[in-house]
Design a protein with these regions (language model features):
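Blade/loop signatures of beta-propeller domains
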Residues: 7-38, 266-268
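Short loop/turn segments immediately following the C-termini of beta-strands
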Residues: 16-19, 64-66, 122, 171-172, ...
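Extracytoplasmic beta-rich repeat domains
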Residues: 40-53, 84-111, 139-161, 171-174, ...
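Short coil/turn segments that connect the beta-strands within blades of beta-propeller domains
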Residues: 56-57, 114-115, 163-164, 208-210, ...
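WD40 beta-propeller blade core
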Residues: 72, 127, 178, 221-222, ...
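Short loop/turn segments that connect beta-strands within beta-propeller blades
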Residues: 75-78, 130-133, 181-184, 224-227, ...
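Blade-level signature of beta-propeller repeat domains, shared across WD40, Kelch, NHL, RCC1
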Residues: 350, 374-400
Length: 400
């Protein structure tokens, strides 16, 4: 488990209840009819890639409507809108052609904590809202107040909750990482001068110490989540506008990172002695290059979809050695959830599948076309209900 906080029911933020895209659901089907799993409901939704949060009978996410961003609460059983909060979101920096092609909607996944939903839009507009009503509790413009760079593809890092704090990867002089009080938005700490990337940070525990891990423009680094003190840093060397995937932590102190384009994958071994954290790079390879999808570690294997805008291969790699166990060209570029001994795979073309992973390869149990291109958002699973979105729609599916 990569997250150091207690698991939450539902799907409270990026990575789900434990922050590692693993869910303790049981009773998932091993096969579907030709039409795929039973659809409970579907509805139109505006542009964006923000994940869907689940809390009881409510869902929360963000989307773009014209030049307005919307934080919305939906009824989980019907998809009906319960409340929405809107705010102007005219793009403040000219996006590049890739961003225009693939949409200008919000990308960061919001966060549920202590009765609030915290959401960050394309321009770095951060709202804390009451989850029951959508009433604004506090607001910060990360770009205007703290000079967070608005990259050519917008703001992407998802926030984290930690002991009453909201932790954000902000970037800029003195603001690489920031911590805000969840109740009133006060800045608790703000430190470092590293430029940010699109990657979301994670929380891990290294030999008894909680650490906040973030992929920056050129470095991956760890800080103390309570005060922001720098614990360690290590160069990864790919420009921040191309660094997107989230680091993957483990209880053994291994941190796995991967980037696409000219990047690759590497494993770092973190150890603590005499109050200091040391970092050792175990290996580097270009044989696995995860773009913007997520990765999942099961035992000694890390699984992810390798490739950027060309062919994609679902890949398994030994985290301790960097040796590729297998590559399968079964899907377009894809995201993953692990539950009930199976992967739920959603590729960017809208193909949904159940597949059983092993060290030898991937056994596909069922697959069905459920949406159109492009589906880059990791689905959310609570019980046997899967919530899936594209740039146009959101679906609820029964996987039992």
């Amino acid at each position: 488990m990569s997250c150091t906080t207690a698991p939450s029911p539902g799907w409270p933020g990026w990575g789900g209840p434990t922050g590692d895209f693993k869910v303790k659901s049981r009773g998932l089907a091993n096969s579907w009819s030709g039409k795929g799993p039973r659809q409970l409901w579907n509805r139109e939704l505006g542009d964006g890639y923000s994940g869907i949060l689940v809390d009881g009978n409510r869902l929360y996410t963000l989307y773009l409507d014209g030049e307005t961003e919307v934080v919305v609460a939906l009824e989980a059983t019907t998809g009906k809108t319960l409340w929405k909060h809107t705010y102007p979101a005219a793009i403040k920096k000219n996006p590049d052609n890739t961003a225009r092609k693939y949409g200008l909607g919000p990308q960061a996944t919001p966060l549920l904590t202590k009765g609030y939903v915290v959401a960050i839009g394309w321009n770095g507009d951060m709202y804390c809202l009451k989850k029951s009503t959508g009433e604004v509790v506090w607001f910060h413009s990360l770009s205007q107040e703290f000079n967070s760079p608005v990259l050519s593809r917008g703001y992407s890092p998802s926030p984290l909750a930690y002991k009453g704090l909201i932790l954000c990867l902000v970037g800029g002089q003195g603001h690489s990482f920031m911590a805000f009080d969840v109740e009133d938005g006060r800045v608790i700490w703000s430190k470092h001068n590293f430029k940010r990337s699109h990657s979301s940070p994670i929380l891990i525990n290294v030999d008894g110490q909680d650490q906040l891990i973030g992929m920056m423009d050129q470095e991956i680094l760890g800080v103390n989540p309570s005060n922001g003190d720098l614990l360690w840093s290590h160069t990864h060397g790919l420009a921040g506008d191309l660094t997107i995937s989230t680091p993957l932590g483990g209880q053994d102190g291994l941190v796995f990172i991967s980037t696409a384009y000219t990047g690759g994958s590497r494993a770092l071994q973190l150890t603590r002695s005499n109050g200091q954290t040391s970092v050792q790079e175990l290996w580097f390879t270009k044989k696995m290059r995860v773009h913007h999808g997520n990765m999942i570690r099961l035992g000694n294997l890390v699984y992810g979809s390798s490739g950027d805008f060309g062919p994609a291969f679902l890949t398994a790699i030994h985290v301790s050695t960097g040796v590729v166990a297998w590559k399968e060209r079964l899907f377009a570029k894809a995201t993953l959830i692990y539950a009930d001994g199976k992967f739920i795979v959603l590729d960017e073309d809208g193909m949904l599948a159940l597949a059983r992973p092993s060290v030898e390869g991937l056994t596909v149990l069922a697959k069905a076309q459920i949406l159109e291109h492009n589906c880059w958002t990791v689905p959310s699973l609570v019980g046997t209900t899967l919530y899936v979105r594209s740039r146009k729609k959101v679906l609820a599916l029964d996987l039992k």
